[in-house]
């Protein structure tokens, strides 16, 4: 693989019991790029996203064939530490899910789990993470208030800060703005542009406009298959596949 490739799947099949949800997915994700996964509901894009940090392991009847590599190491090898994998490949979910703790503790929790105990180090890392998530100025005077008192958009940025605190290399985002208003959505999108300078970002979105605004590369999924992938501008102006064109132009979906 090219040295710029941070993560890739090769011949990936995924099953829920006897049902095959993903068919032969081969896709590369480059360093410091945003890749948008698009496609109609049920097409497999979120299932694929959850394969990238083995969240689907939590489903007893699930099964994976093929491989997914992070820095050319197969994340499904038996010796892989899944907790460490999920530190390296962080995830932000569709609905903000802060812990019922203070703003400070939401960010510090993952650091403590990963062995950080020094108070000064924790404080520095919490501030740094909140700054990276563009939230510090809004919460710096109420760090010990409940995170549940934040607005939806602030809660989502807190969840991003929580993911960033443990220094991931890849950030997965499953429709991170779908539950937010337009102003909060704009802040999340601006944040994605900033974060890609440091991270590889993979985002699932139902919004064609959002995919066009935030991503460098777009991958179109349909009925569990990867139909087309390429430069976002090209995909949205000159798609190479009729199914891609029909979906992007709203003929189905």
Swiss-Prot record:
It catalyses: phosphate(out) + ATP + H2O = ADP + 2 phosphate(in) + H(+). One of its GO terms (molecular function) is ATP hydrolysis activity. InterPro entries: AAA+_ATPase, ABC_transporter-like_ATP-bd, ABC_transporter-like_CS, P-loop_NTPase, PstB-like. Its EC number is 7.3.2.1. Residues 7-248 form the ABC transporter domain. Its main location: membrane. SMART domains: AAA. Keywords: ATP-binding, Cell inner membrane, Cell membrane, Membrane, Nucleotide-binding, Phosphate transport, Translocase, Transport. One of its GO terms (cellular component) is plasma membrane. It is found in: Cell inner membrane. ATP binds at residues 39-46. It is a peripheral membrane protein. The keyword Lyase does not apply. Transmembrane segments: none annotated. GO terms for biological process: phosphate ion transmembrane transport. NCBIfam families: 3a0107s01c2. PANTHER family: ABC TRANSPORTER I FAMILY MEMBER 17 (PTHR43423:SF1). Part of the ABC transporter complex PstSACB involved in phosphate import. Responsible for energy coupling to the transport system. The complex is composed of two ATP-binding proteins (PstB), two transmembrane proteins (PstC and PstA) and a solute-binding protein (PstS). Belongs to the ABC transporter superfamily. Phosphate importer (TC 3.A.1.7) family. This is Phosphate import ATP-binding protein PstB. It comes from Oleidesulfovibrio alaskensis (strain ATCC BAA-1058 / DSM 17464 / G20).
């Amino acid at each position: 693989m090219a040295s710029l490739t941070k993560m890739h799947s090769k011949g990936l099949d995924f099953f829920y019991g006897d049902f095959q949800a993903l068919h032969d997915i081969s896709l590369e994700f480059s360093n410091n790029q945003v890749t948008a996964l698009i496609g109609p509901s049920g097409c497999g894009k979120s299932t694929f996203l959850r394969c990238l940090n083995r969240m689907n392991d939590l489903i007893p009847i699930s099964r994976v064939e093929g491989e997914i590599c992070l820095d050319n190491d197969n994340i499904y090898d038996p010796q892989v530490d899944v907790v460490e994998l999920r530190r390296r490949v962080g995830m932000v979910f569709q609905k903000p899910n802060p812990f019922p703790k203070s703003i400070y503790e939401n960010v510090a929790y993952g650091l403590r789990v990963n062995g950080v105990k020094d108070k000064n180090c924790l404080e520095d890392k919490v501030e740094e993470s909140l700054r990276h998530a563009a939230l510090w100025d809004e919460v710096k005077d109420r760090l010990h208030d409940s995170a549940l008192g934040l607005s939806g958009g602030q809660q989502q940025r807190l969840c991003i800060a929580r993911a960033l605190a443990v220094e991931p290399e890849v950030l997965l985002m499953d429709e991170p703005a779908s539950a937010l208003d337009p102003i909060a959505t704009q802040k999340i999108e601006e944040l994605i542009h900033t974060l890609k300078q440091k991270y590889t970002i993979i985002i699932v979105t139902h919004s064609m406009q959002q995919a066009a605004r935030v991503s460098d590369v777009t991958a179109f999924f349909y009925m569990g298959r990867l139909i087309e992938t390429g430069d976002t501008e090209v995909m949205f102006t000159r798609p190479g596949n009729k199914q891609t064109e029909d979906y992007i132009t709203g003929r189905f979906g």
